[in-house]
């Protein structure tokens, strides 16, 4: 890139930025702005799956619209949780002075992400709710269990 932009790239079709989210695609990865999927454009989303890489890219009203349309959403708190998980691994390693190799970190990350996804998917199926609400249900249940184990409640 010599122009600093993709605009005018030879052989590419230029698309209005407001229509990018409405392109027909299997998976949509909103990765930049909060509230970019909202009640004004959610009904025009053509993706079958949305994996939220940005923080809060979908508004609550859009969540409901997408759920009613049958669009599968992997909410931001699940899709972008890898960094937080690995930060936790770093804290655990530092506190115990026992350090893992890259393979061990990746294996642990895979286990945590897979378990989280299964938990959210199960909550979604059992309660017939949208995925963000399912993720919140799982999260609140885990915090409640941790508080109970610690004798706080």
What would you call each of these model-derived segments?
Residues 43-153:
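Adenosine-phosphate binding glycine-rich loop
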Residues 1-41:
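A structured beta-alpha segment of the ubiquitous adenosine-cofactor-binding alpha/beta core
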């Amino acid at each position: 890139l010599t122009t600093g932009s993709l605009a005018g790239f030879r052989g590419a079709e230029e698309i209005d930025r407001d229509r990018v989210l409405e392109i027909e695609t299997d998976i949509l990865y909103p990765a930049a702005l909060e509230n970019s999927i909202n009640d004004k454009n959610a009904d025009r989303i053509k993706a079958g799956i949305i994996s939220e890489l940005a923080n809060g890219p979908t508004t609550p009203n859009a969540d409901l619209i997408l759920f009613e349309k049958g669009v599968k959403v992997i909410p931001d708190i699940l899709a972008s949780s890898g960094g937080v998980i690995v930060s936790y691994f770093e804290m655990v390693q530092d506190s115990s002075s026992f350090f893992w190799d890259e393979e061990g970190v990746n294996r642990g990350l895979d286990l945590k992400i897979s378990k989280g996804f299964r938990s959210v998917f199960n909550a979604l199926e059992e309660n017939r709710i949208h995925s963000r609400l399912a993720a919140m249900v799982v999260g609140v249940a885990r915090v409640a269990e941790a508080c109970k184990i610690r004798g706080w409640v």
